[in-house]
Amino acid sequence: MPAYDQLILPYSSADADIEEGKLIEDLIARSRSPIPDPDAWLSGGPRAGIVLTTVDQALGWARSRSLWPMLFGLACCAFEMMAAAGNRWDISRFGMEIFRPSPRQADMMIVAGTLTWKMAPAVRRLYDQMAEPKWVLAMGACAISGGTFSESYAVVPGVNRVIPVDVYVPGCPPRPEGLYYGLMELHQKIQKADSLKGKLHLPRLD
Amino acid sequence: MGLKALAGAEVAGKLATALPGAVTESGAASITVDSKALASVMRVLKESPEFEFNYLNSVTAADYIEYFEVVYHLTSMKKKQTLTVKVKVSGRENPRVPSVTHLWQGADYQEREVYDLMGIHFDGHPNLKRIALWEGFKGHPLRRDFL
């Protein structure tokens, strides 16, 4: 057996580590306050005067019934999300059984679990890579506010510091029923939303 | 088939002839070793036929304000024995202990973790850098005086 220091080990370079550290510190500095929730749809009220189906209604119906979630389990909430996807609770009833491993094919991101600052740039980058229109559901106490780790040096105190959140589902972890309630709320939100307005542009993260 | 925890006094007695003065204290199932003698004690514990501690369960550390204590849990798969080895390190600025990665490769990530969270330097470690936190993080969060 070769000596330990002769083995080729998969170490990353020091430069890459320093670059990553700078990115994280930069993101922390820019995330002092939460990003406002996208709520432009709330002021609208029901559309009046048109009996025929508008394009927006058709689009909203289509979008809300074919949400493809992004595969994104960070902590123990992910198991409840998996249970929701499994046959007992059966997420395919909502037309969203296809969890996409690529952000470019996903419409919504279920942030299921504790988000650490080291993971935060990855979450933000994946969110940026998702195509519009896109929605975010924060699942569980940690994703909402950092939960029991909210004062930690390593945990993001609520994912809305990093990405805008549409629906918050409380619980530690929430049961699949809770997740479904959040998803149905999101369906209503999508149907009410104006398809052309209310986009939030975040500064680029490089 | 259970593991037997070796008594500290027994191990200290066996080590006293080969390495006099290396063991400073002995507990019920642990020995406390002088930090200068750690490398040689660990080599004996791993290689001598009396002990043959061929498995390192864990490397961890505790902060007692006056000093740090680095703790090694050893197991001998052959002899079905376990032992805890402790080292006291003083000084909050630059505490240093020798690395044991050349004896047990499994110490690599665990020593990095201790370095990351406690700020204890391991001399001779091949890749001593932060493992859980990012480069540029200020301080070592498991220290009692952090924050």
Regions found by a protein language model. Name each.
Chain B
Residues 1-147:
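Terminal low-complexity/charged segments
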